[in-house]
Amino acid sequence: MRIEASPLYLDTSALAKIYVQEADSDALDAALTGRRDILISELALTELTSALARRVRESQITAAAARRIYQQLLRDVRAGEYRLLDLTPATHREAERLLLTIGRQAPLRAADSLHLALAALADVRALITYDRHLHAAALALGSFEVLPISLDPAA
């Protein structure tokens, strides 16, 4: 995957692939190597932490591994690997607007509407998601390039 657009926003499904080896992790890592224009949100940090806890409950990773991944994520944020976007009242109002417009055409969940609103308000040029619902909603919005093009239908 080659990504020309800048800046770009990673939702939680994309951020997870950086920290937990999954399908497409290597391709995404290669595409993002050396970039300094990556935006993520506080929401993604919380959602990724929830996903790590789920993987521990399901015995996919150990609690120690989850803590290591979480600590690495925080180190990367502090080191400036990502620009961290906050959820603000304006973000919530935009998400609500998207739910009432795009949400009529595409399945748009509340958390996904927040990711979409964050990306739109930050004027990103590309959104990277591996979530099929967010992918469809982002395409319906039409404000930026939506990657990756191929998605796992089971996602």
What residues fall within each predicted segment?
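Acidic, PIN/NYN-like endoribonuclease modules and their adjacent C-terminal/linker elements
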Residues: 1-7, 101, 120-155
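Metal-dependent nucleic-acid phosphoesterase active-site entry motif
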Residues: 1-25
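PIN/NYN-family metal-dependent endoribonuclease catalytic core
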Residues: 9-10, 26-87
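Alpha-helix capping/helix-boundary segments
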Residues: 14-15, 44, 91, 115, ...
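Alpha-helical elements of the RecA-like P-loop NTPase motor core of helicases
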Residues: 26, 93, 135-136
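Acidic catalytic patch
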Residues: 78-103
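Conserved SAM-binding loop
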Residues: 84, 108, 127-128
